[in-house]
């Protein structure tokens, strides 16, 4: 689905953890890293497309994130001809994107790269918000800069510690705050700490595969 100017509507996702680090995914079978993104289907709103892509690419559900902000307008980039399939050259010009800034509300092990039969990434990592843009494929750098800059004003909004494995009813939620035997609270806290440790170990194992210090650029078009 292209607009009259030849741009495909698309959403981009900048996912933050509690330390304001951002999620980077490694393209499957490649040595290139990028933010999650994907096209908006006919009849979808940008927000609906964002939640669909979030699940398809990294396995997260709406309850695992909070929307912190989004870009006011479409951000566009043109794709060089060498990256465009021959059959659509002359019609397809590039992408126009609405970017969402999300805050992780779940745990690292809620991220699943094989949530669908057609995974986009085979590894992931958290990285500093202002990762050098030399690491991004050249024709997308301006859009990344615009999105990161516009959304940076939201960085301290809704900053929080990730949810415990008990949600709002665990040792760090309603029940933990408002009473219960001390011994039970301590026991639940110990269980939560162990669950978080197991989760972090699982997530660390998932990110160990070929993770560079910073994402590196790719020579392949990432216009999906």
Curated annotation (Swiss-Prot):
Motif Nudix box — list its residue ranges: 38-59
By its UniProt entry, which InterPro entries does this protein fall under?
Answer: Nudix_hydrolase (IPR020476), NUDIX_hydrolase-like_dom_sf (IPR015797), NUDIX_hydrolase_CS (IPR020084), NUDIX_hydrolase_dom (IPR000086), RppH (IPR022927)
Which Pfam families does this one have?
NUDIX
Q: Which UniProt keywords apply?
A: Hydrolase
Residues annotated as region Disordered? Answer: 165-224
- Skewed-composition ranges (Low complexity): 181-204
The segment(s) forming the Nudix hydrolase domain are 6-149
Name the cofactor(s).
Answer: a divalent metal cation
Q: Where is the composition biased (Polar residues)?
A: 214-224
Output the Gene Ontology terms for molecular function. pyrophosphatase activity
EC id: 3.6.1.-
Function noted in UniProt: Accelerates the degradation of transcripts by removing pyrophosphate from the 5'-end of triphosphorylated RNA, leading to a more labile monophosphorylated state that can stimulate subsequent ribonuclease cleavage.
The similarity comment for this entry is: Belongs to the Nudix hydrolase family. RppH subfamily.
Record protein name field? RNA pyrophosphohydrolase
